[in-house]
């Protein structure tokens, strides 16, 4: 189980990313657009730099939905490898069967 403070910090970051996502995408579009003037591009870069660091999606960490474990994360299930194995063996994941060949 991950520390509660780490889980809470990640949840707070997810909220900040969601709040700024639309504006960040708009600024990035202006910066990347070949038709925007150098002044517009510089202004967009400046505003992007002024936004909080936690507004960037790269600062998020994928965590297990049950206990917050940060490593061994399976995107398809939203679980860590440990929790995935535990739930699969107990039959709580529909369609997941033990491999045999």
UniProtKB/Swiss-Prot annotation:
Part of the 30S ribosomal subunit. Contacts proteins S3 and S10. Keywords: Ribonucleoprotein, Ribosomal protein, RNA-binding, rRNA-binding. Pfam families: Ribosomal_S14. Residues 38-53 have a biased composition (Basic and acidic residues). Belongs to the universal ribosomal protein uS14 family. GO terms for cellular component: small ribosomal subunit. InterPro entries: Ribosomal_uS14, Ribosomal_uS14_bac/plastid. The keyword Ribosomal protein applies. GO terms for biological process: translation. It comes from Saccharopolyspora erythraea (strain ATCC 11635 / DSM 40517 / JCM 4748 / NBRC 13426 / NCIMB 8594 / NRRL 2338). GO terms for molecular function: rRNA binding; structural constituent of ribosome. Residues 31-69 are annotated as: Disordered. This is Small ribosomal subunit protein uS14A. It comes from the Bacteria. NCBIfam families: PRK08881.1.
